[in-house]
């Protein structure tokens, strides 16, 4: 690659799309987002939210960035903040992996932990509380509603997938954390490229199916789960439900099992939310209408970020169930 980048924030994107040969029927294509500079899909939004704040004059060296995160967005913001010389404070539920805490600190971020039982809502509440004490000192990026989040996927991830598949994509599968990934990619393919028949599938935890509850008119009852990075427990503003065609729920155990499976059978190091996306792909591929369709699955992060979790600490007795 004959190019010198201005700083590491500009190295996002152009991640590989890899055919799975040992899982599914050969029509599942995995978008490996761990090939981004801080090894997750969140690198894209971490860079773009900071670039956007700079362009709009909301960020300078006297302002400290603050954000609530489940880990990967925080790591992405931390690497960009380090590369562009900004101070950063992150608020994260203490239920997230030890690896995430260590990475954040190593990248120079100040880390505040909140009670894990309150989930992302608790972290967001704490971030808002801190900013309210000094609105001139802090910039809260608000990843769940910041339009720079889906924008970067509409500008980069969507076009990359379209180019690599030559437009031959029938189904997109993505877990929902902030909703930015699936919204941005789907908007690009359905609206910009005009492929209205794309089936966009959102994945959420079975234990916390708030999107499913919302769409069925039921009371939203978030629950605890182990799929770090998706299932925030509320409907994020960046999730455009008008673009989504299907919701598939995946249990924490299914997600962990399939993350192990893709590592062992395909040689792709994958995190738990990647396992959830693969589980959803295998479910939809079993349906007669979709068994021969081209499926693109977003794999958000790599396995090393989960060494202290159940992804690496136990095996399953009921593997045949999946």
Curated annotation (Swiss-Prot):
Recorded metabolic or biological pathway in which this protein acts: Amino-acid biosynthesis; L-cysteine biosynthesis; L-cysteine from L-serine: step 2/2
UniProt cross-references to InterPro entries, sorted A to Z: Cys_synth, Cys_Synth/Cystath_Beta-Synth, CysK, P-phosphate_BS, TrpB-like_PALP, TrpB-like_PALP_sf
A GO BP entry: cysteine biosynthetic process from serine
SUBUNIT field: Homodimer.
Species assigned in the record: Buchnera aphidicola subsp. Schizaphis graminum (strain Sg)
An MF annotation (GO) of this entry: cysteine synthase activity
Top-rank taxon, per record: Bacteria
Binding site for pyridoxal 5'-phosphate: 72, 177-181, 273
Residue positions binding hydrogen sulfide: 8, 35, 269
Signal peptide limits: none
Family matches, as NCBIfam families: cysK, cysKM
One Pfam family, short name: PALP
Keyword terms: Allosteric enzyme, Amino-acid biosynthesis, Cysteine biosynthesis, Pyridoxal phosphate, Transferase
Cofactor(s) listed: pyridoxal 5'-phosphate
Modified residues (N6-(pyridoxal phosphate)lysine): 42
EC numbers: 2.5.1.47
Record-linked Gene3D superfamilies: 3.40.50.1100
Chemical reaction(s) catalysed: O-acetyl-L-serine + hydrogen sulfide = L-cysteine + acetate
Annotated family: Belongs to the cysteine synthase/cystathionine beta-synthase family.
EC primary class: transferase
Protein name: Cysteine synthase
């Amino acid at each position: 690659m004959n190019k010198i980048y201005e700083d590491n924030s500009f190295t996002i994107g152009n991640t590989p799309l890899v055919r799975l040969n040992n899982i599914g029927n050969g029509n599942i294509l995995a978008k490996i987002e761990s090939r981004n500079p801080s090894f997750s899909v969140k690198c894209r939004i971490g860079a773009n939210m900071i670039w956007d704040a700079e362009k709009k004059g909301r960020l300078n060296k006297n302002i400290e960035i603050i954000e609530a995160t489940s880990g990967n967005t925080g790591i992405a913001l931390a690497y960009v903040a380090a590369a562009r010389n900004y101070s950063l404070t992150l608020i994260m539920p203490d239920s997230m992996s030890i690896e995430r805490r260590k990475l954040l600190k190593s990248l120079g971020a100040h880390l505040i932990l909140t009670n894990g039982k309150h989930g992302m809502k608790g972290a967001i509440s704490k971030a808002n509380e801190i900013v309210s004490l000094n609105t001139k000192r802090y910039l809260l990026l608000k990843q769940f509603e910041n339009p720079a989040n889906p924008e970067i996927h509409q500008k980069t991830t969507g076009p990359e997938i379209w180019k690599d598949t030559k437009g031959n994509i029938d189904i997109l599968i993505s877990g929902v954390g902030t909703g930015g990934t699936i919204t941005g990619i789907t908007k690009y393919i359905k609206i910009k490229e005009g492929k209205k028949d794309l089936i966009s599938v959102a994945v959420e935890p079975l234990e916390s199916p708030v999107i499913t509850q919302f769409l069925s008119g039921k009371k939203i009852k978030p629950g605890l789960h182990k799929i770090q990075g998706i299932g925030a427990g509320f409907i994020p503003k960046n999730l455009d439900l008008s673009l989504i065609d299907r919701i598939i729920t995946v249990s924490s155990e299914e997600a962990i099992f399939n993350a192990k499976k893709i590592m062992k059978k395909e040689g792709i190091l994958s995190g738990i939310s990647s396992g959830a996306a693969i589980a959803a792909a295998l479910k939809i591929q079993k349906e007669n209408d979709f068994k021969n369709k081209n499926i693109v699955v977003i794999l958000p992060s790599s396995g090393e970020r989960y060494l202290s979790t159940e992804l690496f600490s136990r095996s399953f007795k009921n593997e045949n169930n999946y």
